[in-house]
Amino acid sequence: MNYSFLVLLLFISVVLFILFYINKEAVILYSNTGLGKFIAIILILSYATFHIGMGIVALIILLSYYKVYGYESWNILNTIDFLDGIDVIYYINLERSKERKTIIEEMFKDNIFYGKPIQRIDAIDGKDPTEQVYDKLVINTKRNSKLEYACLLSHLTTIRTFAESTLYENALILEDDMTIELKKFWRKSLRTVMENAPADWEIIQLCYITGGLLKSDYTLNNYQRNRYGGIASMGAYIINKTAARKLMTEMYDPVTNKFSLRDYHTHEADHYLFKVLRTYTYKYPYFIYPTDNTSTLHPEHLNSHIRSKSRIEYMYYQLSY
C-alpha cells in the first residue's frame, strides 16, 4: 500500500475541513469550480479504495457542505444554467459611454450568458443639449432633472421593446455598469428565483443599494422610505411580459410616441417603476456595481454604493443556506 499517497490525501482533507469550519468564503470559492468538486469525488473514491475509514471522513465533510449550502450548490461540473428562465437580456448604454459598452460586452463572453439573446438599448442622453427629453413625455408637473427623466425614459423604452416582442416571456434588464463579481456566490438559477417568488411579482430586483441588510428572501419594494432610506437601483432586474405589456398599455401612446407619467409619483426610474409595478427585491443580489463605479447620473452616490456593496459581500461571507 502506498502510504505516502494516503498521507497526502489525509492532508488535503484536513485542509478542506479547516477551511470549511473557519473560512466559508474559501470553501465557496473552492467549491464553485467544477474542478473543486471533481477533486472531492476523486478523494472519496481514493479513500474508499485504500482505507474505508478515510473514505467515511471525506464523505462526512462533503455531506456537511451539502447540508449547509443546499442541493443546488452541488453542481459538480458547473452544470447549473444560472440564467435559466431568462429569455432575453437587454442592456442600456449611452452612445458616448464607449468604455462601458466594451466592458459589459466582455462580461457577456462569460459562459453563463452562452446562447442568450442579448440586445443593446440606446439610452436617452440627458446631457445632450439636442435631446428633446420632455417632448417624449406627457407630464403636468416636472418633478426631476432632465437627467432623471432621461434615465426613466431609457428604462421605459427598454420595457416597451420587450413588451412588443413575440418570442420572450421573461427579460433581464441591465444597466451598463453591472458586474458579475458576485457570481462566485450564486447557488440558484434565476428560474428558481422566479418560481420561489411571490406569485404576484412583476419585477424582481437583482441589484440593490440600501442602508441595511434585508430580512426576507423577497421584500416588497414600493419604495417606501424607511430607516435605511429605501431600496434603490435599477441596475439589474427581471420583468415578465404580462407586467411589461400592462405598463405600456397604461403609459405609452403609439400614435404620439409619448409616455404619460402619473403626477403622484416621483419621476425617478426606480421610485416610479417600483411604485407602479409589483416589485420584490431578492435578498441575494446576482449583479453589483464595480467598487470604482462613477455613475453617469449620480456620481455623488459612490460612497453609498461602496458601503452597500460591503454589506452585501459580508452577508454572503456569513451565509449559510
Positions of predicted regions on the chain:
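Alpha-helical transmembrane segments and their membrane-interface exit regions
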Residues: 17-18, 61-70
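Short hydrophobic alpha-helical membrane-embedded segments
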Residues: 5-12, 29-39
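A cytosolic-side transmembrane-helix exit/cap motif
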Residues: 29-32, 52-61, 74-76
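Generic transmembrane alpha-helix motif of multi-pass integral membrane proteins
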Residues: 38-49, 57-62
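Short, amphipathic, aromatic/basic-enriched membrane-interface segments that mark the entry/exit
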Residues: 20-32
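An acidic/histidine-cluster motif and surrounding catalytic segment
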Residues: 76-174, 178-321
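Acidic, glycine/proline-rich intrinsically disordered low-complexity segments
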Residues: 1-4, 70-78
